[in-house]
Regions:
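Acidic catalytic loop of the alpha/beta-hydrolase fold
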Residues: 234-238, 264-265
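Catalytic histidine-centered segment of alpha/beta-hydrolase-like enzymes
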Residues: 262-272
Length: 282
């Protein structure tokens, strides 16, 4: 039986209330839906249903689909957007946490594709959502049109210095949370709403802490679709240069964008992503 991923029933309620408030306060025409899967109920947000081509958004760890709201507003002008609450994370989907060592996460996403009759889609994954995107794209490359990886996990290990600091800061309560956020954000300026969101999740959610799964060269060589990697030069969690170098050596159709003024929190990048998405298909 799965233990709850929230720190208490009230902690879960706080996150869900914030989730609902974020949607209410947005001006988006969103549909909220739930799908049954082998791994439990999966909740997702949908916009731009008048468009044919699909963009699927996969958020990072300790997050949920509302983290994409500003991006959904942009993507939905040209694409049908599906922002999924990843199972086992801080959203409205089941609290199931499949193993990173198996292809269960890919099978879960495949069930969503099948249920929604999706033959092919563009996928945008951020951090751990980038890892999930890679797990799916290497398992079912024929279902992915274009792959956009925003500072993805799974290419190189997380920096040991960051892990040590994060563990130490996690013992310091509120002060520690502030320090972790400061460390992750670096000198990057972000909206106060993002900082409040990060603090809410850290206070009320049990982050998943397990051994990382790093994809092999053989697995990454299955990425036959066009791949865009975007990283922040100031990322303290994983080296943007090392990720770019490894992918460049393996992936045939590969594009890199490095943003000097950004760290690990990559927001407002849709204008940079659209040219890649909208390239003429061969």
């Amino acid at each position: 039986m799965n233990k709850t991923v929230f720190k208490s029933p009230e902690a879960k309620n706080k996150i869900i209330r914030a989730y609902d408030d974020a949607i209410t306060n947005s001006s988006l025409n969103l549909k909220a839906n739930v799908l049954k899967t082998t791994f439990g109920d999966t909740h997702f947000l949908e916009a731009g249903s008048q468009h044919q081509e699909i963009v699927i958004l996969l958020h990072g760890a300790s997050s949920n689909a509302t983290s994409w709201l500003s991006d959904i507003a942009e993507y939905s002008k040209q694409y049908k957007v599906i922002a999924i609450d990843i199972i086992g994370e801080a959203g409205k989907s089941a609290e199931t946490r499949p193993s990173y060592e198996t292809i269960d996460f890919a099978e879960w996403l495949k069930e969503i594709f099948d249920s929604l009759n999706i033959n092919k889609a563009n996928i945008v994954g951020l951090s751990q959502g980038g890892w999930l995107s890679l797990r799916f794209a290497t398992s079912y490359p024929e279902l992915v049109d274009r792959l956009i990886l925003l500072t993805p996990a799974g290419i190189i290990p997380t920096k040991t210095t960051f892990i040590i600091k994060a563990i130490l800061y996690s013992l310091l309560g509120t002060t520690g949370r502030i320090r972790i956020n400061r460390l992750v954000l670096g000198s990057q300026r972000v909206d106060n709403k993002i900082i409040s969101f990060m603090d809410l999740i850290q206070t009320n959610f049990k982050a998943r802490i397990e051994k990382e799964y790093i994809f092999s060269d053989d697995e990454l060589s299955r990425l036959t679709m066009p791949v865009l990697f975007i990283g922040g030069e100031q990322d303290v969690i994983r080296s943007t240069q090392k990720i770019a170098r490894r992918l460049q050596n393996i992936v045939t159709d590969f594009t890199i964008i490095v943003i000097p003024e950004m760290g690990h929190v990559l927001t407002g990048l849709v204008p940079r992503i659209f040219p890649f998405l909208n390239k003429t298909k061969h």
